[in-house]
Amino acid sequence: MDLNNPPSKRFGDDDDIPANKRPKNEEYPEIPGYLGNRKPSYTQNPNSGPGKLHYASPRPNNVSSSVGVASGGDRQEADQLQDALISCGIQLKEEELNLSTSFYDPSSLNTFALTTEDRSRKSDFLNSFVLMQTVSNIVNLHRLKSMDSDIHALISMAVRDYLANLLQKMIVESHHRTSQLHTDNYKQVDNVRQTLANFAYKEYESEERRRTVLNIRRAEHEARLAELNSASTNEEGSSRRRKEQSSSAAAKNISEDAQNRMTNATASIMAGSALPSGGKKYSWMATDMTPMTPAVGGGFGIRKKDSNSLKPSSRDGVLPLQQEEKGIITIRDALAVLEMDREGAGRIFGRGAKAMMRAYIRLKD
């Protein structure tokens, strides 16, 4: 290709050449942009057949093709773009409406939902015939005129929700009953049972000492009062003989209760239990007064031990946990939930009370 010489100008490249001298394609007729102020359109028209063009109505003289002041080239491009959208079958108003609304429209996606009935207020949990008959009997009993049609469905849904809550609580009670406490991280350092027994024994000893000291002080106080009373009656003489007589008379005037208290206090002091530091306790003072069980055979022999094989026991004093089967709701779980139920002002009456009594009787048996 020669780049120095410009290419020769072909026939038909110049716009100044009249249209009648241009080559025409007979298979595709020429489509003019404007023919008598009428625009061509590719949409369907009942007067035109398939594959034919029809022209829209002429534009009014007072309406411009573009808004504002625009050049002739911009107006022509806007008109050509509008013609292209119309020829493709795109409707601008519908596209604008689709863009302004949400993408998810249940009514347009699910056409079956529009044809079916509303199930939001209906429930098949209870038998509708029996429920309607029961409600009608109650309405007639109270002499009511009319009743809403949604009452039966609401009663059925309320019963379903109430029973679902009760069953959920029973399941929680069952898990709580069968669950075990994880005590692997804790170790028992001391014997708690023996420690508590020692505390109780020490407290018992301190209480006995306190009572003994109080009895001694009470007896001394009563003896002093008796001495003062006897000294006031015998004012004459200060000899030794009169003093001995006054002391013997004072001892005789002491009541029997005071004498018994003084005797017990003296015995306690002699035994050593009344001292603050304690004293020696003999075996005959610590023995229990309960009678011994007779030997086997009625004579001297080996004592028969009590059979405690049925009772669970442990060396450290802690009872072992009972192994129960999991995943079962027992009568105890149901009764615990019903007792803690606060429906109906926290009271159980009517058939509910009868059901509770039957459950308790069955549990007792």
UniProtKB/Swiss-Prot annotation:
Keyword set includes Transcription: yes
Annotated region (Disordered) at 1-76, 225-259
From what superkingdom does this record's organism come? Eukaryota
Q: Which residues form a coiled coil?
A: 202-236
Keyword Nucleus in record: yes
User: How is this protein annotated for GO cellular component?
Assistant: chromatin; nucleus; transcription factor TFIID complex
Keyword list (alphabetical) reads:
Coiled coil, Nucleus, Transcription, Transcription regulation
Give me the stretches of Low complexity compositional bias: 63-73
Q: Where is the Histone-fold domain?
A: 164-227
Family annotation (Pfam families): TAF4 (PF05236)
Q: Which CDD domains match?
A: HFD_TAF4
Q: What does this protein do?
A: Functions as a component of the DNA-binding general transcription factor complex TFIID. Binding of TFIID to a promoter (with or without TATA element) is the initial step in pre-initiation complex (PIC) formation. TFIID plays a key role in the regulation of gene expression by RNA polymerase II through different activities such as transcription activator interaction, core promoter recognition and selectivity, TFIIA and TFIIB interaction, chromatin modification (histone acetylation by taf1), facilitation of DNA opening and initiation of transcription.
Protein name, entry field: Transcription initiation factor TFIID subunit 4
Supply the source organism for this entry: Schizosaccharomyces pombe (strain 972 / ATCC 24843) (Fission yeast)
Source lineage: Eukaryota, Fungi, Dikarya, Ascomycota, Taphrinomycotina
Gene name, please? taf4
